[in-house]
């Protein structure tokens, strides 16, 4: 699958189902802990520096951001989970908004869950994975920041993530570096299989 970086657009930042765009395209949700690098991942996958706004401040994405990817699919950037500095009320609102989208959106075909390869999955990562599996959603795990660990340790770290999540047979895990774009084509091919 090839994507034209000049044909990417942010359609809407939505908080309610009635704001979701009706494009007829299938959707790929991107979920992950705050500061796991979702925006950086999106920018690197589509070959655009600042399409998805990146921030040093975790918890910046507070809406569902729908990106039209070259009229081939929609990326939906979901607010990061596990960020302690937002109020309990805000966390509950995010939770409801995300749950509504994930459980009711027919166009959603796969959830790409990003996990920092350097660390074991957090309790929030495990809860998110279990939640997605409860609703029978296919999950593609992307272990981000591969360039931050020694090459010889990648497989060990991937195995740790698999074991901690109790990754189901049909779900795939791929390591990725937004710095080198290593495995970018493998990820596009994996996403395409779900559409």
Swiss-Prot record:
It holds the Pfam family MMR_HSR1. InterPro entries: G_ENGB_dom (IPR030393), GTP-bd (IPR006073), GTP-bd_ribosome_bio_YsxC (IPR019987), P-loop_NTPase (IPR027417), Small_GTP-bd (IPR005225). GTP binds at residues 32-39, 59-63, 77-80, 144-147, 176-178. GO terms for biological process: division septum assembly. Mg(2+) binds at residues 39, 61. GO terms for cellular component: cytosol. Necessary for normal cell division and for the maintenance of normal septation. Belongs to the TRAFAC class TrmE-Era-EngA-EngB-Septin-like GTPase superfamily. EngB GTPase family. PANTHER family: ENGB-TYPE G DOMAIN-CONTAINING PROTEIN, MSS1/TRME-RELATED GTP-BINDING PROTEIN. This is Probable GTP-binding protein EngB. It comes from Staphylococcus carnosus (strain TM300).
């Amino acid at each position: 699958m090839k994507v034209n970086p000049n044909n990417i657009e942010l359609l809407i930042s939505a908080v309610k189902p009635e704001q979701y765009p009706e494009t007829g395209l299938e959707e790929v949700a991107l979920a992950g802990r705050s500061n796991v690098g979702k925006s950086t991942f999106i920018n690197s996958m589509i070959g655009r520096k600042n399409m998805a706004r990146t921030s040093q401040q975790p918890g910046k994405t507070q809406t569902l951001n729908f990106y039209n990817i070259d009229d081939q699919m929609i990326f939906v950037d979901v607010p990061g989970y596990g960020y302690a500095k937002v109020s309990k009320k805000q966390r509950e609102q995010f939770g409801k908004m995300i749950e509504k989208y994930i459980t009711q959106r027919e166009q959603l075909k796969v959830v790409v869950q990003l996990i920092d390869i350097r660390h074991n999955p957090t309790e929030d990562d495990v809860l998110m994975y279990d939640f997605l599996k409860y609703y029978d959603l296919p999950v593609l795990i992307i272990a981000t920041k591969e360039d931050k660990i020694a090459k010889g340790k990648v497989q060990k770290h991937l195995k740790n993530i698999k074991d901690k999540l109790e990754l189901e047979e049909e779900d795939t895990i791929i390591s990725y570096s937004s710095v080198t774009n290593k495995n970018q084509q493998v990820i596009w091919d994996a996403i395409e299989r779900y559409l």
